[in-house]
Structures are given as C-alpha cells and as structure tokens.
C-alpha cells in the first residue's frame, strides 16, 4: 500500500483514492497488481509524481499505465521547455484525456495537484472522459472506499486529515 501527498509523505494503505484538501491533494493506492484472482505482483507502483505539482494514479493494465505515464511526463516536460512555464493541473488532465481518446488504454487515472494554492483533482476514464471532483476512488475497491470518503470528507479538510481518511478508505 502506498499513500502520497504533495509534501512527499509516504505511508502504507489499499485501493486508488484522491482527496483535495484546503492545503494540498492526497493520493493513496494499494500496491498489489492483480488480474481477477491472480496476484501478478505484490509491489506495483500506482502513484506517479509527474513534476513538483502534479501527481497521477493508475488502476488497470500495467503495460498501458506505464506507457501512459511516460507520455504524460514527456508532454508536461515539453510544455515546460517550450513555454518556460509549468503546465497547469487542468491542462495536464486535458492532455491525458486526449491521449486516452487516441487509442484504447485499459486504465482509469486520477490526476491532481496544486496550481499555486488551488488544489484540483480529475478522474479520467479509458475513453478519455474527464471529471473534476473533490474526492475520487478508482479500482475494484472503490465502492467500499466511497463509503468512507462520503462519510468523512468536508470542505475544510487538511492534508493531515486527508491522509487519515485516505488510509481508512484504502483499508475499508
């Protein structure tokens, strides 16, 4: 299990979750790679730091996820080099949606981070659909995780509280 927030705090937790907080964005995921009843790998990376203000998570095909992460990292880096400015979180989510629309990738992605002092979080489906929300869960355990998120989330949540809720949602 892995929990990551924009302050590089790493803890152990279970399922893919993103939570916007008044002072940041918190991400959590299980670390097991599975296909149905088969556990393919016990320690799979599912949270990726794209740059110093954008993080993404993946649920789905490992190969597609690794490919998608490389493309997103390249697009964000190219933008920064060409424009001498950081790509916004919303722009990175839009680029990711466009990539997903261009071909079938069997992944569901959370992408979020901070633009200045504004936290934002997006869910991207395999067809490139993009939805912004304050908290999101993906993967097979998301139904149970949403129960915790809906019960505990509030607008003034801090990243410390968000970490606690993310771990609870993952372990639910």
Feature map (PLM): residue ranges:
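Short arginine-rich
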Residues: 169-172
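A mid-sequence, solvent-exposed acidic-amphipathic segment
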Residues: 105-136
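Conserved short S/T/G-enriched processing/targeting/catalytic segments and their helical context
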Residues: 1-105, 131, 136, 142-164
């Amino acid at each position: 299990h892995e929990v990551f927030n924009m302050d590089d705090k790493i803890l152990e937790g279970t399922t893919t979750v993103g939570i916007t907080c008044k002072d940041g964005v918190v991400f959590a995921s299980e670390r097991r790679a599975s296909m149905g009843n088969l556990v393919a790998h016990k320690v799979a990376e599912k949270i990726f730091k794209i740059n110093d203000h954008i993080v993404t998570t993946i649920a789905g095909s490992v190969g597609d996820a690794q490919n998608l992460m490389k493309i997103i990292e390249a697009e964000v880096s190219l933008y920064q080099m060409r424009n001498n400015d950081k790509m916004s979180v919303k722009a990175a989510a839009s680029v990711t949606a466009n990539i997903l629309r261009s071909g079938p990738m069997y992944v569901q992605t959370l992408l979020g981070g901070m633009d200045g002092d504004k936290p934002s979080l997006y869910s991207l489906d395999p067809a490139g659909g993009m939805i912004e929300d304050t908290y999101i869960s993906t993967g097979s355990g998301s139904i149970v995780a949403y129960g915790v998120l809906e019960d505990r989330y509030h607008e003034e949540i801090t990243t410390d509280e968000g970490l606690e809720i993310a771990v609870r949602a993952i372990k639910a």
